[in-house]
Amino acid sequence: MKNKLGSLSDPKMFHEPISIQNQDTDSLIEMLSSMIMIRKTEEHLAYGKKHGMIGGPVHLGAGQEAIAVGISQHLNKTDRVFGAHRSHAHLLSLNPNFYKLFAEVLGKETGFSKGMGGSMHLYDKPNGFYGSVPIVAGTVSLAVGAAMAATFQKTDDIGVAYIGDGAAEEGVVHESFNLARMQKAPILFVVENNLFASHMHISLRQPSDMVSRFGIANDIPYKLIDGNDVVEVSNTARELINNIRSGKGPGLIELVTYRWFGHVDWRDDIDVGVERSKDDVQNWKARDPISRLSKSMINAEIWSQDREEELINNLDVELAKSWEKAMNDSYP
């Protein structure tokens, strides 16, 4: 396999605090708070799954929070965002209603999909989230169609399609890239390259580890970046989204990241019986997008450990209340 990602895929790299130069303090606090909220929400889901409170599969995205948070900073409620099977962060970054997510995953009628969808069938159109599905690459063509509809409706709304490196092996993705480029559809393709599709590393599935090569093949402007640097994600997304809204056609952003948990449920070191290197998992955890931003803000004296602890303590209280409420809600 050709290593085109270079140091981006090296788990021993990019452990240092990130650059926050010329960044708005309020935006930094907002992004940090959002990432912490998503992380803590998924910790609750992991606990619930481990202890038999949740039925059905739960795909957790801990370690990947910077991607959805950085991109959602530049989206409107009228944009059309489509997720995949690991989409808790995609939804929560648009609408931080973790109570409704808890209710949905627990199968309660107060959930985002009235308790009928669970973890992988999430829907929140009022906040721009048009759905997630368990079918790999199942929403990509829908996102292109929604983006084209925005053009027909003469709005500056855009479509957003979240896909993983595994989804890039599905034919519909390549058809969607081609159609979007030919029609100049206003859509952002977001490739979350966490190097694994289910339990299989990308080196066992593709001749190159750089998924954005497929964007190049379709003449789609692309950016390849560290997906665990929320400031770089935000800045890059802003540039691409501004171009898309101005009528320049589709864009693609590939973000190299790593999921801390296995493919499904709460275990951190195995994927369908295949053990990942414990050293790699620990090194990737040292590239934690939350701690990297937090350290940068503390170093810049715009944040403190005390403020972060207060934020987490208050969040823990609200999460516990929401979980208990959802547990006591009615089934549909």
Give the predicted meaning of each segment.
Residues M1-D10, D26-R39, T78-V81, E104-G115, ...:
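Short, charge-rich amphipathic segments
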Residues M1-I67, F261-H263, D268-P332:
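Conserved acidic/glycine
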Residues G6-L8, I18, L28-L32, M53-I54, ...:
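N-terminal start-of-chain detector that recognizes signal peptides
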Residues E43, Y47, H51-Q183, H201-P207, ...:
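Cofactor-binding active-site loop characterized by glycine-rich and histidine/acidic residues
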Residues F129-N328:
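Glycine-rich ThDP/TPP pyrophosphate-binding loop and its adjacent helix/strand module
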